Amino acid sequence: MARELSQEALLDFLCQAGGRVTNAALLSHFKSFLRDPDASPSQHQHRRELFKGFVNSVAAVRQDPDGTKYVVLKRRYRDLLGEEGLQRPREPPAAAPSAGGAAPCSPRGARRGEPPQQQPRRRRREKEPEEEPAGAAARAADAACNGLPGSDSRRAPGKGGGSKGSPGQRPPVPAAAAAGAQARASCAAAKTQGRCCWECLQNNLAVLPGELGALPHSATAEEKPARALPAQDDRGASREREEGALAEPAPVPAVAHSPPATVEAATSRASPPALLPGPAPRGDRPELLTPSSLHYSTLQQQQQRTREWVARHPQVPEARDQGPIRAWSVLPDNFLQLPLEPGSTEPNSEPPDPCLSSHSLFPVVPDESWESWAGNPSLTVFRSIRCQLSLQDLDDFVDQESDGSEESSSGPKDSPGASEEGLQVVLGTPDRGKLRNPAGGLSVSRKEGSPSRSPQGLRNRGDGHISQQVPAGANGLAGHPLKPLPWPVPKLRRSLRRSSLAGRAKLSSSDEEYLDEGLLKRSRRPPRSRKPSKAGTAPSPRVDAGLSLKLAEVKAVVAERGWRHSLWVPSGEGSAALAPHRTSEHKSSLVPLDAREHEWIVKLASGSWIQVWTLFWEDPQLALHKDFLTGYTALHWIAKHGDLRALQDLVSGAKKAGIVLDVNVRSSCGYTPLHLAAIHGHQGVIKLLVQRLASRVNVRDSSGKKPWQYLTSNTSGEIWQLLGAPRGKPIFPVYPLVGSSSPTRKAKSKEISRSVTRKTSFAALLKSQHNKWKLANQYEKFHSPREREEYSD
């Protein structure tokens, strides 16, 4: 049953169903939302339309010849099936008992209510030669695809009786059977390419037939199943198996791309108590697994898969800590090096090996605080990464549902405290009390034995994402060089949005992958390009520490809110404040107004001078306060209103209060009070500002205009001259600026005009005579008025 009605929930279900699910099964999965008895008819209609939009955006409805309708994932989104594989939909735990009697090799397509003729088609689709990077866990029961003989096939925990709370309760298989299975398992890819296929890697067949001895350390392999792998299927477990296999000097082609640092970490560090008898004590060298213990480890892993299935598909929708982060992910060849999610480990399970920590690729000193973590309740499991992908054409859905938050539209909103926290970019932790939150994806400091809430931040995912440990004894991330990375360094990219939420950052492991824009916000900062930064780390503009991300050393990038966060350092050496946070430099202009400042601006704008003076005498400094929108001060507002008495009262009150008024203060548009008085034609205020307060008349505003250029036609010449208008006629003269000319000057000008005469030419004389002749002879040809009228008609 779906936990929420969202785009990610639909994608998650379709991906788990292999991209194809019956219409009835899809409606049944979301029945709690579409047919909620507590919802009103309007809510039902709204949810129905929302659900239709979600389906139409990523899938299409196809009808088989027998009349069964299927919802099929669109072709452009088929690459999302890389994680879940092409397996058929698995039944939720409620329907699991119905499939309990299925044969071990029965196809995943055999679901309740599906016609028998559909099963061969599903079997053919399952055997298509496509890689399944993380879907092998879902196909563990399909023996033919994994290279295991049918005698050694294991029942899928979710399909058999292992649903709900007691998954995977089966008798152990004899050691001889497991050894025979390993010896007979020869993958075609191992012969042709030198390494096994994904299925073999994920079923502990990553070694060639002649190299069965190079197996993981027993304690390491035994404690791996104790970890839940939320939303990542088997990729993390496969990575651990690879890291364990590297502990032996024997060359293993299947894991040749693993980082050298992992070899050192796996061979030199101590191992914690194991789950089986005879664990290697701390400080001992790793020992090899026997085939029986290897098979038991495999059974434990399948139990964890069952727990993972139950956690991802609860019967009752539960609230999540945080909506999943959406990120487009392209899986490289070495994506098995994937950080695990220890947050969902069962309370009664052993803590994971520090040398194979979920974030670790570098040596780490175990910390005693890890034992206290084992008692903590398991955190909420989030869904598969690929079903949380950020598809660019789905951004509208997500943004509309998120209402300005940076969480996914699928998840319930965080608590207010968590949504306002800033980013902590932490490169690993040896302190096992500091957990990686599966919802937030970052380790945070453990307080009082319980994992603290992680801020929404980096989610270290597959595809070469490396979250690296800070070595013990380091007082800061910059003080201890780390080992070079075996593949390209993760790049940092940001998507900045103007918001009041805290900023966060993400790491991208390749040029094709970027972590989504819609998740990170920077407080009141302009948006930037989505292109990954080619310069490595681009710290936030508010970070004072010089932090960089290089090939040989990885440091922290801190984006902060208005308070301080402390990033921790290993081995209990205390926390080092690596994040110099924003000071009070933003307070003056960016924080909201208090009640008094707001009332001051409102009363000034409305011209309520009595209330203005009351507020002024309560706090005279308000006279210097600028409106955050227009940049107007009290002088600007009074000049705009043109109240001469109010201006006089303000000037006298400021003198009494000892406040120096700046009469030339400029607004957001560059206006001085004199500009506003000229624009609105308040001549009395202009005189007072210029003559008494010595306001400057040659100050230009943002348009390059001086106050006199705003004067209108009804302005007196005195004001024109007072504001320094150019000599001569003004633009809109009403009467001359200078006194009237003397009578002698007027008489002289008349005489000059009279003396200027024009002599007529002979042509003009002839023309005048010709016109007279035409007028005299115009009507002579018409002898009577009647003829003249007829001609005119």
Curated annotation (Swiss-Prot):
The keyword Zinc does not apply. Residues 96-108, 134-144, 175-185, 246-273, 407-417, 498-508 have a biased composition (Low complexity). ANK repeats lie at residues 630-659, 669-699. This is Ankyrin repeat domain-containing protein SOWAHB. Transmembrane segments: none annotated. The keyword Phosphoprotein applies. The gene is SOWAHB. Pfam families: Ank_2. Residues 220-244 have a biased composition (Basic and acidic residues). The lineage of its organism: Eukaryota, Metazoa, Chordata, Craniata, Vertebrata.
